[in-house]
Amino acid sequence: MGIFDKLKDVNEMRKQAKQIELQLANETVSGSSSGGKIKITMDGNQAIKSVEVDAAVAGDKSEVARHIRSALEDLFKHHKKMLQSKFGNMMQ
């Protein structure tokens, strides 16, 4: 394989990466803490789109922190499932 063939392959990979990035930008996933006190939504490229906080926990810093952690764990679990369902064959 010559250098021009390798460059062609690199350019093709860049195109594919850009297409995947565009596809992921159109996907959204959400995660919420137990009890739904905090809900976080992001796109498939992991850009946070919204954070919703129930007023019932807003005044308690330690409870807010606990709920944020729980919501983020749930969010990334859903994000991983979305990636596996869309691109599972590419992730092996």
Predicted features along the sequence, with ranges:
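Long amphipathic alpha-helical segments used for membrane anchoring, targeting, substrate engagement
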Residues: M1-S30, A71, K77-Q92
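N-terminal intrinsically disordered, cationic/polar leader segments
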Residues: S32-S34, I40-S50
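Residue-level signature of catalytic and energy-coupling elements of molecular machines
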Residues: V10, Q46, I68
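Short, charged, low-complexity patches
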Residues: K61-L72
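A short interface-forming secondary-structure element
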Residues: A47-E63
